[in-house]
Amino acid sequence: MSKAHPPELKKFTDKKFSLKLNGGRHVQGILRGFDPFMNLVIDECVEMATSGQQKNIGMVEIRGNSIIMLEALERV
């Protein structure tokens, strides 16, 4: 059985990200940490509602299996 490898996200730590999540949710924030299952810790997180409203939700942990897409908003 192959061993799980951690995601290559170390160079993106402390950079701003946009994440598309299952359930049609979209959040933006700063990547503070991650684990081999791609669970992410996002700081200064803002939820972007489909109506255009933004809601500050602070520091959150996002499970890796709920992430559909992630995009770095800053150059590495």
From Swiss-Prot:
BP terms from Gene Ontology = mRNA splicing, via spliceosome
Q: What is its main location?
A: nucleus
Q: From the UniProt record, which GO molecular function terms apply?
A: RNA binding
Spell out the subcellular localization from the entry.
Answer: Nucleus
Give any Gene Ontology cellular component.
spliceosomal tri-snRNP complex
Ranges where the Sm domain occurs: 4-76
Described by its record, this protein's role is as follows:
Associated with snRNP U1, U2, U4/U6 and U5.
| UniProt name for this protein | Putative small nuclear ribonucleoprotein G-like protein 15
What is the organism of origin for this protein?
A: Homo sapiens (Human)
